[in-house]
Amino acid sequence: MEFDPAKINTSSIDHVTILQYIDEPNDIRLTVCIIRNINNITYYINITKINTHLANQFRAWKKRIAGRDYMTNLSRDTGIQQSKLTETIRNCQKNRNIYGLYIHYNLVINVVIDWITDVIVQSILRGLVNWYIANNTYTPNTPNNTTTISELDIIKILDKYEDVYRVSKEKECGICYEVVYSKR
């Protein structure tokens, strides 16, 4: 069975994208929650929503030597601190649909996905994550708010604030009665 992007429903809650893959004829319902860290352009996937047992398996794997070594290497390769490769969102009234253990997508694709016994679900999960990453590349939508200041403008700004300083250097603070610009 092939991954079919037409069977994806997408929604979003509090910076978490919820992907639901529903294939009624084959009785497959898969929910994947993904957080995108814009600073690092990194994706974190909620393994608790995929299967509740995966979070416990992951925590146990992480304590073993193979898990520690893999996490250390991934941390070194990505430049992300080891403690930042996972994130937990606690269950509360507001987070009912998105709570769980979020882990770096590399861990999902290369480690956790092999723990899923159903090969069809593995294939669909791989396709779903790759589809999301391919279709949601980071493009900054904030304008570039930088201004170039010439040397002449810098001199004018310094002159203006030098005048303000000259006028205010003898003033006292209204609360503690100390000279505002006292040099210490």
Swiss-Prot record:
<dbReference type="Pfam" id="PF04383">
    <property type="entry name" value="KilA-N"/>
</dbReference>
<dbReference type="InterPro" id="IPR017880">
    <property type="entry name" value="KilA_N"/>
</dbReference>
<dbReference type="InterPro" id="IPR018004">
    <property type="entry name" value="KilA/APSES_HTH"/>
</dbReference>
<feature type="domain" description="KilA-N">
    <location>
        <begin position="21"/>
        <end position="131"/>
    </location>
</feature>
<keyword id="KW-0244">Early protein</keyword>
<protein>
    <recommendedName>
        <fullName>Truncated p28 protein</fullName>
    </recommendedName>
</protein>
